[in-house]
Amino acid sequence: MQSMKRFLLLLLVLVSCTPLATPGRPDSSQTAPAPRLPGMTSSAFVELAGERVYFESGGTGTPVLMIHGIGAGNSSHLYRNNTLALSKAHRVYAFDFPGFARSGARAIQYTNDLYVAVIEAFIRSVVREPVQIIASSYAADYAIRLASEQPQLITRLLLSNPSGYGLDLDSMTLFGGNASRNPERFKQFADTPLGTLIFPVLNSESGINFFLYYYVYLDWRKATPEVTRIYLENLEGPNKAYAPFSFFSGLLDQPIDAYWPTLTQPVHLVWGTDDVFNPITEVSLYLEKRPVPLTILRARAIPYEEESEKFNAVALKFLR
């Protein structure tokens, strides 16, 4: 399942951007664009763990950090149907991971360790107090690890479709090949023509639409031209291929078997009925090791967007 996910997302990124390398230190002096998420009133760039990170914030109340999952064209825009409702009761923060959307992108290997470090640094440097986290997919895995390692930083976890339970990085294979977590494979994508071989296979707009129709949304009508445009905009600019290259090479995987049972914070799981990559059957792995409340919504990969009103109601009831 993880291999299929990487393959599909790599296809999309290769038809949507070129792997032009412009290495160097991040520039935090750039003026931030206006916030695009409803309810957010400010935006800024901040340097965290050596990377330039774009974030938005708004609202008043106890802090809530919303963290997007990993995928070509992903960003904090995935929470556009949630931020307004939550900002009426909480101080809401949302950032783009390094390598994605408005955050800086460099010609480097991105890793799960880096992204966990970015979350920790954001809480310590920007929020500056313990925070409640809403996270999806891989970001949920990172949040679980951080909540276990640094429990004083995180008070509650509302997690959608996490993906890291049962991962064995030593034995995973990619289409029957070598171990999935493979820095050498990243170098093949980044430094040789292999990374652009699939570029002409799909038209970028149609390729993204295919992915949205069949893997992201259960109701394909929600994959509007405006949504497609946002994904395309998020892929504009140099070095936007390197985070997906890292993903495809297994460098962003985060096993959580050792972390999940040790969590001391209140946790609420939300799962889509028809998620292709993280099927609903996987929820039993989590509940067997640590029983927590579960909400199932009619959706694929992003129940917080497809069923946003129901998700927002769950969030407002769970968060403190």
Regions found by a protein language model. Name each.
Residues 4-65, 88-90, 128-129, 319-320:
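Alpha/beta-hydrolase fold catalytic core
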Residues 140-151, 157:
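Short glycine-enriched nucleophile-adjacent loop
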Residues 51, 57-102:
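Conserved HGGG/HGGXW glycine-rich cap/lid loop of the alpha/beta-hydrolase fold
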Residues 148, 157-197:
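Flexible "cap/lid" loop of the alpha/beta hydrolase fold
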Residues 195-261, 265:
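Conserved alpha/beta-hydrolase catalytic His-Asp/Glu region
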Residues 262-299:
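Conserved loop-alpha-helix segment in the C-terminal half of the alpha/beta-hydrolase fold
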Residues 94-134, 138:
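Active-site loop/oxyanion-hole signature of alpha/beta-hydrolase fold enzymes
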Residues 299-312:
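Catalytic histidine-centered segment of alpha/beta-hydrolase-like enzymes
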